[in-house]
């Protein structure tokens, strides 16, 4: 199968569409929610990135598995997602988590937020980190 260029929609278009539909949260605001009951931080980075450190208490849900982990009908479903009253998604810099937030909203989740700047911004703000 060959790809005819130009693409109908590139990654910049997809990010722009997702950003128009999702809510974001600053690192400063997210830090205040870190130990709040019902708030779940979800790390959508790949396993090798996650192994290098994470936000304490976060759920690892790699972007490629998110739909399966979020769907209660799937055997891979993670109960933590359904139980959370607020979900804060993050990746390295915010791109993948933007698309992940849009995906969860499309699936019917509410109170979903993308961490602006991702883990890079979290580190810059000296947010706490834990070993995976």
Where are these predicted regions, by residue range?
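Active-site flanking residues adjacent to catalytic metal/cofactor-binding acidic residues
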Residues: 42
């Amino acid at each position: 199968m060959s790809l005819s260029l130009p693409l109908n929609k590139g990654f910049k278009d997809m990010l722009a569409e997702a950003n128009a539909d999702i809510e974001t949260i600053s690192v400063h605001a997210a830090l205040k929610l870190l130990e709040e009951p019902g708030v779940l931080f979800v790390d959508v980075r790949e396993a090798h990135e996650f192994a290098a450190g994470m936000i304490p208490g976060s759920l690892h849900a790699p972007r490629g598995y998110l739909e399966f982990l979020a769907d209660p009908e799937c055997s891979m479903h993670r109960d933590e997602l359904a139980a959370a009253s607020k979900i804060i998604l993050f990746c390295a810099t915010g791109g993948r988590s933007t698309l992940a937030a849009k995906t969860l909203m499309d699936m019917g989740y509410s109170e979903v937020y993308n961490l602006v700047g991702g883990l890079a911004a979290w580190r810059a703000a000296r947010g706490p980190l834990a070993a995976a």
